[in-house]
From Swiss-Prot:
Protein name from the UniProt record: Cytochrome b
Miscellaneous section: Heme 1 (or BL or b562) is low-potential and absorbs at about 562 nm, and heme 2 (or BH or b566) is high-potential and absorbs at about 566 nm.
Listed transmembrane segments: 32-52, 76-98, 113-133, 179-199, 225-245, 289-309, 321-341, 348-368
Primary subcellular site in the record, as a coarse category: mitochondrion
Signal peptide: none
Entry's family note: Belongs to the cytochrome b family.
Residues reported in the UniProt entry to bind a ubiquinone: H202
Amino acid sequence: MKLLKSHPFLSLANSYVIDSPQPSNLNYAWNFGSLLALCLGIQIVTGVTLAMHYTPNIDLAFISVEHIMRDVNYGWMIRYLHANTASFFFLFVYLHIGRGLYYGSYKSPRALPWSIGVIILILMMATAFLGYVLPWGQMSLWGATVITNLLSAIPWIGKDLVEFIWGGFSVDNATLNRFFSLHYLLPFILAALAVMHLLALHEHGSSNPLGITANADRLYMHPYYTFKDLVTIFLFFLVLALFLFYAPNKLGHPDNYIPANPMQTPASIVPEWYLLPFYAILRSIPDKLGGVIAMFGSLLILLAMPLLDLSRVRGSAFRPLMKFFFWLLVVDFLILLWCGSQHVEEPFITLGQFATTFYFSWFLIIVPVVSVIENTLIDLATENKS
């Protein structure tokens, strides 16, 4: 124990992971940090291993993935572990953000860790998109073509920017090479941002379900919360193993097992399931530029939450009206996810437009208005009591 506190490096780990004082009333909604760190670790290790056998060439990429699956020892397991952990990574991130929205973890003095977290989410989406292109199946090629083409909506520089990203006049070998390079690099940037997220969080400590300062009653991180984290970690391993060994392609798209063919467009071009809500927002705006702005705006609006929430009460635990609207947002997000997976036809177009309208209304109208109503009711109750 003495070495843990005196060694220059071990003392850092001790203050952040072992002796870190945490509120005594944290529930399982605070376990996602450890799960996300574990997912990122798995992704980096499996990703580096896969990169040793992958060839970023349009003639060899699909074959090299099949080589990994068939000839590399446990290559099938490493690839499926990488693909399915990515799905759980996003699931945990969405739950982590949902917990932050519900319990008001974005409010001062924790606006900085919240902002870093939103940047992490955006980079994660970019990394996932780049990785989806690498197997060079039908979804890879056409997904890359559709998504990169969105940048052509930017006035004046759009067309030149798209050709700069492609490295030519279409998605080709240069595109695959640079996508592979960036997909390899970004997880390490994500790891650095995750450390910054932890450093910023350590400044004021974790929030808690009550939304009040917890200085009066705290517990050490170890053994109390490390063992609590292990419960959800083992549960995660169990569910991940079920997908890995029994349904490894359940969350993927079968068209990506067809080699990329620029002469044949798939019946429907859809991204991975975890990007579908934002894909639905993109599709719901008829104008190309408007759709791109809406898609990026749906992510960047999270950065404005510390300014939009005017309530004096942190979180929704003691705010019945806000609690009701929070669960409406959850339902709306699931509707967007479902709409994004469907063909671009009625009633999914109209439903997606309604869901998109509600999504932005929740942040820009509902949150500030409900905050003002609740503050007014608190003032009236205080005056009547006095």
